[in-house]
Amino acid sequence: MSLVPNTICLFDVDGTLTKPRNVITPEMKDFLAGLRTKVELGVVGGSDINKIKEQLGENCINEFHYLFAENGLLSFKDGSLLATQDIKKFLGEENIKKFINFVLHYIADLDIPIKRGTFVEFRNGMINISPIGRNCSQQEREEFEKYDLEHKIRPTMVSILKEKFQSLGLQYSIGGQISFDVFPIGWDKTYCLRHLPEDKYKTIYFFGDKTFVGGNDYEIANDPRITKSFTVTSPTDTKNFLSELFYKQ
């Protein structure tokens, strides 16, 4: 079967292909395997490659035509490494140290119901910050998300960091349930689009759940290269949109 020409579907991970921080279901895996025979598929996640593998499976780089970890700062095409970028070179160690020191002091003084561990996670192309700590349980994760919606813990912290470190040229993106990402301006999910040749891909569909202003899907969902973006609420929602696009008679 020939693929739909000049077309690719790009997917967020959390809330789009999987439930937040859950693994992909066998049903969704089978659905995507069938879809892959019809149209090219790509994944763009904010997490590092190991976390994406935890959710989508160890072999995921071979199951999509493109896989973009850390917004595309680590990129794979047809299972092979395509390109990498490094935030350490961009910011320099002194700026990174000042930024992380401030973040840790801020979280230490933050009064929230519970704290766990791994408040700062340094990745290849970004810094991930979690006020509650990334090694909280799934139940604690869900409780923090509700608390954050009411008390604006993450948005408040982001606004303070923006003001304090405005000279560094950083961008902040709230994604998932418990954390937010920090990266140089332009290193959001739109970064991955530079790896998709414009003369080949005339139609790009994007599927994501955090397409609101400040969400980590917002920039790519509104990029002029995206033909149409679909705001989804669950993997089932994603599957329904795809069925309408590619299986409707």
Swiss-Prot record:
Pathway: Nucleotide-sugar biosynthesis; GDP-alpha-D-mannose biosynthesis; alpha-D-mannose 1-phosphate from D-fructose 6-phosphate: step 2/2. Its EC number is 5.4.2.8. Alpha-D-mannose 1-phosphate binds at R21, R123, R134, R141, S179, D181. InterPro entries: HAD-like_sf, HAD-SF_hydro_IIB, HAD_sf, PMM, PMM_cap. Mg(2+) 2 binds at D223, T227. It comes from the Eukaryota. Pfam families: PMM. Mg(2+) 1 binds at D12, D14, D209. Coiled coil: none annotated. It is an enzyme of class 5 (isomerase). GO terms for cellular component: cytosol. CDD domains: HAD_PMM. GO terms for molecular function: metal ion binding; phosphomannomutase activity. Homodimer. This is Phosphomannomutase 1. It comes from Dictyostelium discoideum (Social amoeba).
